[in-house]
């Protein structure tokens, strides 16, 4: 799906990141970091897109320990242009320690590091709790005080936060289901941004109500991950027609629609680079 996504960015004159997470090759049978880097070298256009290593957990969705450092080191060696360490299932002190180590590796290579604090649910086995219950209780929301300390002590460049967002399932019985139409707690997001003063990241962007997404971008949310919606467009067409080129076209059209009509990002690429391109 990489080629149609990148072509959509070019045709809409927008900027984005192509991402691969451990979960996708571990459970979803996607290609691993080396194969993705090779494909990106073929299709990538540096004025429009960068390659990001997403969600490398210390403890995974099955509560198993992950040998995460070799994965991150491999990606850096392969030329990935940013990386993410996910220590969100650790306690705060452990998350800080793990993240700080990866930040040092990334910065030594001259690239930014994303980290996560709070519980962005959706990748766990089995059905999640009712969404309205989660949102009303603030279960898993990133704590403002902890976020301030976390950023100060780790030096992370981007922080993934939990403010009502949930991941889409990428494996199992739920992976083809339409995502819950999530909301975002904008006031909580604003407080997080004021406390941390770093770009915040929204994981689980597919299915979030548009009004909340747009308001979030005005309150510190700088990077929005969209995976489920693009993947499902590709897979649905592949099931219907069994023709890869048609599935790629469906992926391309969905990505262009997201860029142009949903987010209004057409023609904004130069803003990312301060008008330098």
Describe the predicted segments one by one.
Residues 1-24, 31-48, 59-196, 210-221, ...:
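Alpha/beta enzyme core
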Residues 27, 179, 245, 249:
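Charge-dense, low-complexity intrinsically disordered segments
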Residues 27-28, 53-58, 266, 270-271, ...:
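Metal-cofactor-binding active-site regions of metalloenzymes
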Residues 52, 114-116, 201, 258:
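Generic enzyme active-site microenvironment
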Residues 52-59, 199-210:
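Glycine-rich beta-to-alpha transition loops that act as phosphate-gripper elements at the mouths
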Residues 223-242, 253:
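Shared catalytic-loop signature of beta/alpha-barrel
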Residues 238-277:
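Extended, intrinsically disordered, low-complexity segments
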